[in-house]
Amino acid sequence: MRRGTSEYEAAQEAMAEILLERARSGDWPIQYGKLSNLLEEQGHNVPAHSVEMDHLLADVSHQESPDGTKTTLSVMVVLKEKGEPGAGFYRLAREEFGRKGDNVGIWGEEMKLLAGDFRHR
């Protein structure tokens, strides 16, 4: 699956719908494996720990917050073993969304933004 293809765009739309619904309902966090399974149920093969998963999470985050003022939706997706986001989330938050601080601080602030952005929806 490559960026810019109809297959990729369909997977991105499906991921956005899954994450937005979970954000609105407060049903987060979600593990990478669970997100992968939900996408698979809709016909999208996106392995949990793959480049495609990283790219889709980044693109969905940019889609929902193009100017970086809202939360990165990828904050809800966590590693089963640690219960926190993977390295790709922190890289995205720092390099593309301009977030500052250590991992714990960035994660905490993004979770607050998530709660604030979706509290009244």
Task: Walk through the language-model features, giving the residues of each.
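Nucleic acid-binding interface residues in structured DNA/RNA-binding domains
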Residues: 1-15, 22-121
